[in-house]
């Protein structure tokens, strides 16, 4: 099974270090391509990365 993680950086190495999840709505990363996972604050937009 492929693992999906929410990341704000484009580099895969940084995404592997930290996993981000949406605590308010309890949403995980999307499973369809690269859609938005959860929004935190104003400047940060987390997207779904597949590894």
UniProtKB/Swiss-Prot annotation:
Compartment(s) where it occurs, according to its Swiss-Prot or TrEMBL record: Nucleus; Chromosome
The species this protein was found in: Rattus norvegicus
A cellular-component GO term for this protein: nucleus
Domain of life: Eukaryota
Modification comment: Phosphorylated by SRPK1.
Matching Pfam families: Protamine_P1
Expression tissues: Testis.
Function: Protamines substitute for histones in the chromatin of sperm during the haploid phase of spermatogenesis. They compact sperm DNA into a highly condensed, stable and inactive complex.
UniProt-listed InterPro entries: Protamine_P1
GO biological process per UniProt: chromosome condensation; nucleus organization; sperm DNA condensation; spermatid development
Keywords linked to the UniProt accession: Chromosome, Developmental protein, Differentiation, Disulfide bond, DNA condensation, DNA-binding, Nucleosome core, Nucleus, Phosphoprotein, Spermatogenesis
Family: Belongs to the protamine P1 family.
Main subcellular localisation: nucleus
Disulfide bonds: 7-15, 38-48
GO MF annotation terms: DNA binding
Protein name: Sperm protamine P1
């Amino acid at each position: 099974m492929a693992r999906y993680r929410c990341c704000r950086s484009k580099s895969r190495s940084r995404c592997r270090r930290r996993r981000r999840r949406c605590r308010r709505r309890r949403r995980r990363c999307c499973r369809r391509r690269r859609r938005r996972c959860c929004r935190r604050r104003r400047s940060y937009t987390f997207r779904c990365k597949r590894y």
